[in-house]
Amino acid sequence: VIVAVVLVGQRRWRAFAAQVIPYAMLGVGVLTFCTLNYTHYGVFALSDFSEGSFAAAMGAMMRVDTDSDKPYLSVPADAREKIYEAVPELKPVAYWLEEDAQMENDFRDPGLDDYRAGSFYWAIRRAAQYEGIYADAQTAANYWQTVADKINAACDAGTLPSRTGKRVATSQPITAA
């Protein structure tokens, strides 16, 4: 912003344009992509992984306190068990994550006997797909928002133990060791 003010003040329009055009092009590209997602799927978002209800659900799941101190686990097994008890909407997905041999073979880390953070996202999405939650984008968005709202409400009420405040993210909370 300071560079732009100086360049405009000195009437160096070409230099100003050289600074602004790349950001404007990026903004137009992102806006175009979001608009295309809205027209095709009914959800105005760049990706459901980085924003919106899926990120809200992942952030809520990672909010639940766990007894596990293993690194790389965003939602360890003990946290998932607590969540399944509090959120009945996740019970059908629980079968796929906890009992289906093929799902475990595809996504679980045998050394940890659990889902690493990166594979958990894809495993829970596949489980949701098997349950018909991804029939269309709006159904999926509504489902994940309901899951996020119920987990956050349970954490706020003290029904589920919470290790952080409300968050919308697919990345694990960063803590100083």
Language-model segments: residues:
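Juxtamembrane membrane-water interface segments immediately following transmembrane helices
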Residues: 27-177
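Transmembrane-embedded, aromatic-rich helix segments that form part
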Residues: 1-7, 48
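Hydrophobic residues in alpha-helical segments
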Residues: 8-9, 39
